[in-house]
Amino acid sequence: MALWGGRFSKDPDQLVLEYDACIGMGERMAQQDILGSLAHARMLGEQGIIPKEDAEAIVRGLEGILSDVRAGKITWSVDAEDIHMNVETLLTERIGEAGKRLHTGRSRNDQVALDNHMIAMDQCKQTVSLLKGLISLLLETAREHLNTAMPGYTHLQHAQPVTLAHHLMAYVEMFLRDARRFNFTCEMADEMPLGSGALAATTYPLNRERVAELLGFSAITENSLDGVSSRDYFLDYIYAASCCMMHLSRFCEELVLWNSSEFRFVEMDDAFATGSSIMPQKKNPDIAELMRGKTGRVYGDLVALLTVMKGLPLAYNKDMQEDKERFWDAADTLNRSLEVFSAMFASMTFRTDVMRRSALDGFANATDCADYLVRRGVAFRDAHRIVGELVAYCLDAGKTLEELTPEEYRRFDPAFGEDVYGAISLETCVGARSIPGGPAPQAVAAAIASAEKKLAAL
Ligand code: ARG
């Protein structure tokens, strides 16, 4: 008979048991569930709500179950529906009557909320630690490439030259923000919901602050209805995960492009590429592509859980049991992606010579050429048109701006002097963009120093 079977004249249909059970997902919260019960039982004993000896027996029993769970010795059963009732049933089997007092002043509704809060906080910490590893790796690579010129793009067209360090630091900024989002999500989840009961708290004199303290929470939830029916902390996590996957997917897309024969900016390590079953020459950047694809799945988790929660009346509704699969799918996908991305990135080779050649190509210095004329007194709008005409001329003549003769320059505007070549060289173009946030080596070095401080503060 189910733990709640008293008012029923029949056992649940087998179809119901299987459809309703969530022990598959519940297994992953077994440790949090037992830790929560340990704190609850200790508090019940301290408050004299249950006899001290019973509380002690429960604590010993739960500690035994916890160590068996950690040792992988326990198989949970679908018949007991969820992790909460599985643990309680096992406890009573092991310690007898005292086990039946554990659930005093508690409901599975606040119990699952507690487990969820703990899991969300654990996963935030796990994700932040993976992000920190990736950020350190990117910083290390950026430090080596302060002077590695490459084209910067808009519309995927050569725009203005930047450096590889500057490009990588853009991702460092994104991942630093992601890590802060997860830390904020952890802060938001840091409220202890036990004591909310099924929905309307309880008449027992529970010491909620004590439970919070035993479990390391900094606060308790302030409203029992909200305590059992909020899933914001999971949604916050999945949103942060979606954002982080979006950043990874942009990086992956660039690596796919950079690895193509058209770009050849990077060479994927053989260990992180796969071949074709028919085309012997192929070496495909599958891992980067797959990660781009998995981003869609995490977005799906976010929309799915938002939709589960949409329009639900207060307080607990069984719909909410769908939360765990979406949460774990997002957390597992993201954490694994961060791990794989870091390994893939660490094994890649950058072809700095190709990047430099490409930066010299495609008129990435045309803006600097116009700025040169401006310094010579020409209005920017006129300078823009003159250099546009120069570019059209170069395209016809099959030349770059650096290859034009002084006479050719002067044909377009008498303000051009011999010093134009210095003004449009790659080093000048990059080096002159030295304001904070710019690609000049000293500006990027400053950005790296600032990112290191932010990383240390995470
Ligand atoms: N297994 C449920 C969940 O994961 C918690 C139990 C509450 N169920 C209930 N019928 N009151 O959300």
How would you name each of these model-derived features?
Residues 1-36, 97-98, 279-458:
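Glycine-rich cofactor/substrate-binding loops
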Residues 49-50, 74, 263-264, 379, ...:
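Conserved hydrophobic residue
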Residues 53-58, 133-137, 182, 258-262, ...:
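Short alpha-helical "patches" and their helix-cap loops
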